[in-house]
Amino acid sequence: MVPVIALVGRPNVGKSTLFNRLTRTRDAIVGDLSGLTRDRQYGEAKWQGRTYILIDTGGISGDEHGMDEKMAEQSLLAIEEADVVLFLVDAKAGFTAADQMIGEHLRKRNKTSYVIANKVDNIDPDMARAEFAPLGMGDAIPIAGAHGRGITQMLEIALSEFPKDDADEPEEGEEEIVAEGEEAKRIPGPSEKDGIKIAIIGRPNVGKSTLVNRMLGEDRVIVYDQPGTTRDSIYIPFERNDEKYTLIDTAGVRKRGKIHEEVEKFSVVKTLQAIKDANVVIFVMDAREGVVDHDLNLLGFALEAGRALVIALNKWDGMQPSERDYVKTELQRRLFFVDFADIHFISALHGTGVGNLYQSVQNSFKSAVTRWPTSRLTQILEDAVGEHAPPMVNNRRIKLRYAHLGGANPPLIVIHGNQVEKVPKSYVRYLENTYRRVLKLVGTPIRIEFKGGENPYEGNKNTLTDRQVNKKRRLMSHHKKADKKRRDKR
């Protein structure tokens, strides 16, 4: 399971600055889910082969009534979700009563916590450690979050208990948290035991629980239910038509066969982890509410992760034709960025259209993991360039030479050529659409990566042999004599 780190502390101690620095290699997945997470911000970061989820919380002022109320509700939830808590204090402001109360609460929670003394610019680190020793939480780790100093030591300590990602290596530039770009995550195909992993995600009360129970209907073959911790999703292996699947349910534990929908506790951490572990994501929306901003934020999670996607509009039954037409228009207008995904109009309660989801899951997964030979991908590239050549840059044509497969789920196509760093975004979209059309990809995003061709002889002088030098001398002498004769005739 991906470790979760929460940043807590008083207002203006530098939590957001540290959050932005740590997530710079992969920008914050979502800024604020208003109404769902309020003051919590979630991002994904990576450090020396370890991927982790980072939570930035609102400040805790310490002037509320009673300790449980003094801790802001969202910060409390973040602490409960986290594996590790980084308790930020302001080294310039010094030790405060609010720091004392927050520290006491963390000690009571028996949560792995570290005191981070931020803003130690021009402050003796030993003095900062001594200043916050009364917290009784061990030596404070001094950092300067705005400048990146001390972050290496902080992350080494915070992540020391967690294993590295499978087959991952540290990324270049991580030591100073300044590397840019991102590495698309690759996941293996379905195991013989688990089958295709399907994550059911969506806002609270859109029908996720009902859909899960409908998909695990009378013809199900449940192998086992494996509940996790309070923040873990439920993994439910089952079979349908001799095909194996594993449902990743973020809605929580429920009684077998319970169909009615209850108010669900929404957890961004559950959603992020479910998406990360899934092969295919079924995104559930409430057709009667249409497309809302929270839907777009959650779809951004799946798109960022590159997972195969199927969209299910639930509660379609009972809607008037005019209402249905309006919803379809809204889908085309607001979900254009996921136009590759199949959309199903269903009623999880009555089962209408639910069975059709499986075919889309199969098709999406097949598109996401199919492998094509280099010759096939290169031919598609050549045809695309022949039909619509790349633009000129500084009077030189961008040259795209060949393509090969770089990864799966999502498909990553690596294109080699010259001046590839100058390929405009519009042409990248043209290539994406071409590959999607020719390869008949459905339900999966596609990513294109460019690699420039290096000239192995660049900077090298051509060294002539003795024979070439003599030949060059004779030719020069011949040209000089010919020029002299022409001048004499004039």
Curated annotation (Swiss-Prot):
Disulfide bonds: none annotated. Associates with the 50S ribosomal subunit. Residues 470-490 have a biased composition (Basic residues). HAMAP family: GTPase_Der (MF_00195). Residues 164-191, 452-490 are annotated as: Disordered. Transmembrane segments: none annotated. GO terms for molecular function: GTP binding; ribosome binding. Residues 182-191 have a biased composition (Basic and acidic residues). Gene3D superfamilies: 3.30.300.20, P-loop containing nucleotide triphosphate hydrolases (3.40.50.300). InterPro entries: G_ENGA (IPR031166), GTP-bd (IPR006073), GTPase_Der (IPR016484), KH_dom-like (IPR032859), KH_dom-like_a/b (IPR015946), P-loop_NTPase (IPR027417), Small_GTP-bd (IPR005225). It comes from Pseudomonas fluorescens (strain ATCC BAA-477 / NRRL B-23932 / Pf-5). Residues 370-454 form the KH-like domain. One of its GO terms (biological process) is ribosome biogenesis. Residues 166-181 have a biased composition (Acidic residues). This is GTPase Der. Belongs to the TRAFAC class TrmE-Era-EngA-EngB-Septin-like GTPase superfamily. EngA (Der) GTPase family. GTP 2 binds at residues 202-209, 249-253, 314-317. It comes from the Bacteria. GTPase that plays an essential role in the late steps of ribosome biogenesis.
